UniProtKB/Swiss-Prot annotation:
Its main location: cytoplasm. It is an enzyme of class 2 (transferase). The active site is at 91 (schiff-base intermediate with substrate). Pathway: Carbohydrate degradation; pentose phosphate pathway; D-glyceraldehyde 3-phosphate and beta-D-fructose 6-phosphate from D-ribose 5-phosphate and D-xylulose 5-phosphate (non-oxidative stage): step 2/3. InterPro entries: Aldolase_TIM, TAL/FSA, Transaldolase_3B, Transaldolase_3B/F6P_aldolase, Transaldolase_AS, TSA/FSA_arc/bac. Its EC number is 2.2.1.2. One of its GO terms (molecular function) is aldehyde-lyase activity. The keyword Cytoplasm applies. It comes from the Bacteria. This is Probable transaldolase. Gene3D superfamilies: Aldolase class I. Keywords: Cytoplasm, Pentose shunt, Schiff base, Transferase. Transaldolase is important for the balance of metabolites in the pentose-phosphate pathway.
Length: 223
């Protein structure tokens, strides 16, 4: 299973990359907005420059989302984003127009991450349109009292049935259990917020066991 980090914060990306387990990055307009000190002065060129900086840190796929909704503009932006770096993956929303843009861009060799996917039928369309990745948003489904991980299970089984090459990239992860369940279901990738990556490391028995070992080690050293 591959681990991506879901953030646009360069410090978080660097810290996660230093752990040695990071395979890629996903960003979106909301994540970028969080790190911008003055949104009114933040231009589209600034956004592209920021994505380039992310690509300098991580040697792996970096998803950057289009910021428009018409198919022609999504295609134009997608081509601009893909030109930033070979590792850039263009995120397009799973809409009628988004699907058109995905088909065009993927047909021209640009990798696509189909985002905002909330149903198996949307995931099938993403695969048919040539998306390299499909991003089911499990946390947002949980928020409306729908079992988000059930969607992941359905997509994995459908893709296995037809041997679609599209990778299942589980998004909107809220806690470590989402990651574990995604792994058990055979999802290809989990894109994880920085704080949840830290939570993956934690277990109270590890902490208590380490304390005991260190206490015993101090006795040995004294002897």
């Amino acid at each position: 299973m591959k681990f991506f980090i879901d953030t646009a914060d360069l410090e978080e990306i660097s810290a996660a990359n230093d752990l040695g387990v990071l395979d890629g990055v996903t960003t979106n307009p909301s994540l970028v907005a969080k790190i911008v000190s003055d949104p009114e002065k933040f231009t589209y060129q600034d956004f592209k420059d920021h994505i380039a900086k992310v690509c300098e840190i991580v040697d792996g796929p970096v998803s950057a989302e289009v910021t428009t909704l018409s198919p022609e503009e999504m295609i134009s932006q997608g081509e601009e984003l893909a030109a930033i770096h070979d590792n850039v993956v263009v995120k397009c929303p799973l809409t009628r127009d988004g699907l058109k843009a995905m088909r065009h861009l993927s047909g021209n060799g640009i990798r696509i991450n189909a985002t905002l996917v909330f149903s198996p039928s949307q995931a099938i369309l993403a695969a048919k349109a040539g998306a390299s990745y499909v991003s089911p948003f499990v946390g947002r489904l949980d928020d409306i009292s729908t079992e988000g991980m059930a969607l992941v299970d359905q997509i994995v089984r459908i893709y296995d049935n037809y041997r679609f090459p599209t990778e299942v990239l589980v998004a909107s992860i809220r806690h470590p259990q989402h990651v574990v369940e995604a792994a058990l279901m055979g999802a290809d990738i989990a894109t994880i917020p920085f704080d949840v990556i830290g939570q993956l490391l934690k277990h109270p028995l590890t902490d208590s066991g380490l304390k005991r070992f260190m206490d015993d080690a101090s006795v040995i050293q004294q002897g």
